């Protein structure tokens, strides 16, 4: 069968494209190399508990807010979303001080002005930026760090407004203001957790895809995109099966996608060199904890904990874990106590490079000891805001950038895809279109990462595809 659209990769971007195109009446197939679809949205099960991989909270789902209309279109507003605390959806702890980030632009200013009264005018300017998001062509060339340090006089306040660093990679020399404000703005509008796993989103989208006649094929790993007359004709898999199509969308990292085009005559060398040369953001180390029953009351916010006021540079420290994000899973049984929390911290690929040739579950004792040490350090840091956490732990599971690489094909286990660079923005911001007229890209590597970024990019990919046709 020759499909109208062949989509490679079943992450959020791929599934959104598939749903929308299938509902337009096109014949669509989604090819997924893993046995379970969903990419970074999928959850995994251990000892009766479901754990999320990449989804922890979402911003801007309220009416009139950033993601509301898109999620309404996708049928995702019907899922059991729980709104986080308005007085402090994120609690930022730096050293021994804790500062809440409050929902709503006015409340955000009022709350932080209570700690920094002399910075109220600067906070109002900052919120104006969040409220009226600047055009990409202007803000992509501005350094986020330079902007913040010129706006605020108090270095501690720069650290506080930047402290949700686990949602993006903070690099003083390269992070564009565009990426920074888009990664924060929707969460200030409103922040939400799913009462359940990320699989709820995956299953909802797949249900709609199948209802519209689309197909999902798992355990189908692409190894080659075959060309004919300057266009992609088919995607060939490891088992020899080919999926023929008129249009192709890759929800896989662009560098991996180009690896399927080694003998391409349609792909020019300039484009290949550009994509190959792009750097990737850092990966994440995650500890998924199952807590003993009735030991920790549920907290309806996220906790960001830093050893000291070096939010922009803590990943460069050599003295152990310097920052951690703590996210609690909403109790699904109505309990007031939480059974599962995740701890996350950035992890350099240099800590993984000695194990790059290993497989999941077979990386050796040194790797396991390194993970245990890092997990202990994260828990110790988290105990600054959750006293006695270590004694509450029943079981724990860990993952590293190697895990992400092996499951999602993200080079170096990158958590946020290609690194955007304000010094060379045109090189690092990618279009859904490629030099091959019927091959398109989607996903977090193009313009913006995160749920919001991937959702908007998917709709942009669909629009590009329709204009090209």
What do the predicted segments below correspond to?
Residues 1-122:
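N-terminal glycine-rich phosphate/pyrophosphate-binding loop and immediately adjacent elements
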Residues 55, 444-466:
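A conserved FAD-binding loop/helix module that cradles the flavin
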Residues 91-109, 134-137, 210-211, 215-216, ...:
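Feature captures the FAD/FMN-dependent oxidoreductase FAD-binding
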Residues 94-176:
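Rossmann-like flavin
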Residues 154, 158-168, 384-448:
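A glycine-rich dinucleotide-binding beta-alpha-beta segment and adjacent secondary-structure elements
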Residues 181-232:
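Helical element adjacent to the flavin cofactor pocket in flavoenzyme catalytic cores
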Residues 223-336:
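Mid-domain catalytic core of redox enzymes
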